Amino acid sequence: MAESMNKIFIAIIAIAVAAAATKMFTSEEPKSKALPVLVKGEYMQFPLVSIKKLNRNSAIYRFKLPTDEHVLGLPIGQHITIKAHIDGSEVVRSYTPISLDSEAKGYFELLIKSYEQGKISKMFTSLKIGDTIDVQGPKGFYEYTDRSSKHLAMIAGGSGLTPMYQIIKSIAENPKDKTKVTFIYGNVEEIDILLRDDLDKFAASKPGQITIHYLLDKPSENWKGGSGYVTPELMKEKLPAPADGVQLLVCGPLPMVSAIKRSAVALGFPKAKPVSKMNDQVFVF
């Protein structure tokens, strides 16, 4: 009897060991955790790996991170600072990447519109594959989460699109994010509308939740969107009225931003502060 029980016990142990070994060799490796690369207050260099031309003066520049497991480490809505030495002087400018840490492992992307008087933006047009840029971050006082607001009213002009694009993309790709977005995006001509296909795709993915209104200064005869400037009347017609849970986000050329801030006050929004903070109802990037 004792011998029989010993045999049963040994058999049970053997089965358990075999099962454990099978699990050890067949289980999937745990997914490696993304490694943020940015260190606040420190400049880091990243090499250019590709350029995608969008139109006559805009392109997407992709830069490589140290490994494919690294992410930039930038909260949604924040920006980086780029430093360059141009004509004997140090020049610093801020840019918001269009890539999100949730998808961009091993790289980050910047949408750059080159302006005639823009020293850094013109510097980008001279970059060649393998050239590096000096980057510091994260910077900024806005950090989007799906609990930030119930309804985001956005207004942007030209390359001021980039922080809005990041936020809209995050909302569109998160099934649990129910934040409403109403976005007025102004440009000079139709060719100047940046990442339009992506924006239309985001809106189509959540109809009724994400709404985008295009506005042109110089529309063609066949243009079916809006025309002119962002006026108080247009804001009142297209955007939500000021209320709890509504936040107005603004980014673009200084004259446009100044006019929008005045219009927002006329519509009942509080006056924008000189430096916007996360909980301000009017936030200027």
Curated annotation (Swiss-Prot):
Residues 41-145 form the FAD-binding FR-type domain. It catalyses: 2 Fe(III)-[cytochrome b5] + NADH = 2 Fe(II)-[cytochrome b5] + NAD(+) + H(+); 2 Fe(3+)-[Dph3] + NADH = 2 Fe(2+)-[Dph3] + NAD(+) + H(+). Pathway: Protein modification; peptidyl-diphthamide biosynthesis. FAD binds at residues 125-140, 151-183. Its cofactor is FAD. SUPFAM superfamilies: Ferredoxin reductase-like, C-terminal NADP-linked domain, Riboflavin synthase domain-like. Its EC number is 1.6.2.2. Keywords: FAD, Flavoprotein, Membrane, Mitochondrion, Mitochondrion outer membrane, NAD, Oxidoreductase, Transferase, Transmembrane, Transmembrane helix. It is a single-pass membrane protein. GO terms for molecular function: cytochrome-b5 reductase activity, acting on NAD(P)H; NADH dehydrogenase activity; transferase activity. Belongs to the flavoprotein pyridine nucleotide cytochrome reductase family. Monomer. Component of the 2-(3-amino-3-carboxypropyl)histidine synthase complex composed of DPH1, DPH2, DPH3 and a NADH-dependent reductase, predominantly CBR1. This is NADH-cytochrome b5 reductase 1. The gene is CBR1.
